[in-house]
Amino acid sequence: MTLPEHSPLGKPSAYKTEYDASLLFPIPRQPKRAEIGLPEGRALPFFGVDIWNAYEVSWLNLKGKPQVALATFIIPADTPNIVESKSFKLYLNSFNQTKIASPEALQQLLHHDLSEATGGTVQVRLVTEADLGTQKMGELDGLLLDRLDIETDIYEPDPTLLSAEQEESPVEETLVSHLLKSNCLVTGQPDWGSVQIRYVGAPIDQEGLLKYLISFRNHNEFHEQCVERIFTDVMRMCKPVKLAVYARYTRRGGLDINPFRTNYNTPWPDNRRNARQ
């Protein structure tokens, strides 16, 4: 099994500038899922995707002229592995002095390598220079929890902060906070994010939910793992009929990671970059 502590994170790394797929470092999802009550073999209570955006993609055309693009990678949540982010960056940098016939050829290569590493089918989208002007920005929709004047001193995840008024009539709400902060599982470096929670069910106590999201502040876990922990805690403590959790994290090393988990059929998020990204 590949373990996070064996990854390139927190270690000096040589930056290869010619293509090397072996730089990708997969990490199994299952051990961290077991920690949140999802043992191996049990059906997952959610489905979804991890949306990765890469802003520093460059290669050479066959004449040696540099090319640049933005790339989006859509990784299904049911793949057995995630890819450690520093290894992803090193892998992308390995294209910098590599000659590739066309953007389409690069896209096919990225699709193959990422699918191999994650154990599933990864969608790859490239935005080349000609289409950079089509990119849009926008904030997460929803009622802002950060407006609440709460007091807290809890900075490790505490599901008991969550509650819902089960005697009340069901509601449909979309709640948003920009106060999500967690830390890298290996290095302890801060990860900053915005999170959107959409649900149908008994009204969730908003102050408790905000305190709960803030409680991740000293917690060490990868982005995908934090979102799955939020999803399972809200399901267990608040018992909504429908739930979708979407987080957009600020970029590091030219990459941002945006996990989405839901228990009902709904379109995937539209991947609009927000102002903090």
Swiss-Prot record:
One of its GO terms (cellular component) is cytoplasm. Pathway: tRNA modification; tRNA-queuosine biosynthesis. GO terms for molecular function: preQ1 synthase activity. It holds the Pfam family QueF_N. Substrate binds at residues 83-85, 223-224. It is found in: Cytoplasm. Signal peptide: none annotated. NADPH binds at residues 85-86, 252-253. It catalyses: 7-aminomethyl-7-carbaguanine + 2 NADP(+) = 7-cyano-7-deazaguanine + 2 NADPH + 3 H(+). InterPro entries: GTP-CH-I_C/QueF, NADPH_dep_7-cyano-7-deazaG_red, QueF, QueF_N, QueF_type2. GO terms for biological process: queuosine biosynthetic process; tRNA modification. The active site is at 184 (thioimide intermediate), 191 (proton donor). HAMAP family: QueF_type2. NCBIfam families: QueF (TIGR03138). Catalyzes the NADPH-dependent reduction of 7-cyano-7-deazaguanine (preQ0) to 7-aminomethyl-7-deazaguanine (preQ1). Belongs to the GTP cyclohydrolase I family. QueF type 2 subfamily. PANTHER family: NADPH-DEPENDENT 7-CYANO-7-DEAZAGUANINE REDUCTASE. Homodimer. This is NADPH-dependent 7-cyano-7-deazaguanine reductase. It comes from Cupriavidus metallidurans (strain ATCC 43123 / DSM 2839 / NBRC 102507 / CH34). The lineage of its organism: Bacteria, Pseudomonadati, Pseudomonadota, Betaproteobacteria, Burkholderiales. The gene is queF.
